[in-house]
């Protein structure tokens, strides 16, 4: 990734252009059983880690000195959430501003194969009532059309939290987007189906360290 091809922006995160082709698979360490199912390494693990640390800095700057309930969206968000929370804790230990955190979990189901379903399923939504009056940081893996997050925020608003911020590792540029933007974005990416770093395709590829683009062979192989 060169300086000319990647545009840093606080609002949009790191913007990866449509013509970015990623890295060849053979220059990274990948599980052999996945190599034929992937098109490229799109975002290397080290870049993800560095970007996550910067997001943690931004969160400390904006909402330090608060007690935060971190709402991790499972399953895809768990790795980003784990790393983000760890970075925030490390920053908090060495800062005059202290963030105390508790982590809770919710599951959203909106995909079958690589197609977004019309109806959002919120699993664990009955527990949202305990977020009333709390400062909430929602941690998500990817914003696709924005409809999923908009629906979750609408549901959460019924319980009147004190504050809600959203951090998403990825935001996808899509013609079907409702233009929702999270408060903190890791990377803005083209309209490609990506896997790895806990993002899955029918529960496969979560164990990849890098974010990769799945190819058509992989989609057909693991289709349900």
From Swiss-Prot:
Stretches that traverse the bilayer:
none
Q: Keywords in UniProt for this one? A: Magnesium, Metal-binding, Nucleotide-binding
Residues binding GMP: 140-148, 172, 193-194, 200
A GO MF term: hypoxanthine phosphoribosyltransferase activity
Asked whether the keyword Nucleotide-binding is assigned, the reply is yes
- A GO biological-process term: purine ribonucleoside salvage
Residues binding Mg(2+):
140-141, 200
Which Pfam families does this entry report, sorted A to Z?
Answer: Pribosyltran (PF00156)
Superkingdom of origin: Eukaryota
Look up keyword Iron and say if it applies. no
> What PANTHER family does the record tag this protein with?
HYPOXANTHINE-GUANINE PHOSPHORIBOSYLTRANSFERASE, PHOSPHORIBOSYLTRANSFERASE DOMAIN-CONTAINING PROTEIN 1
- Similarity comment: Belongs to the purine/pyrimidine phosphoribosyltransferase family.
This protein's name: Phosphoribosyltransferase domain-containing protein 1
Tell me the gene name. Answer: prtfdc1
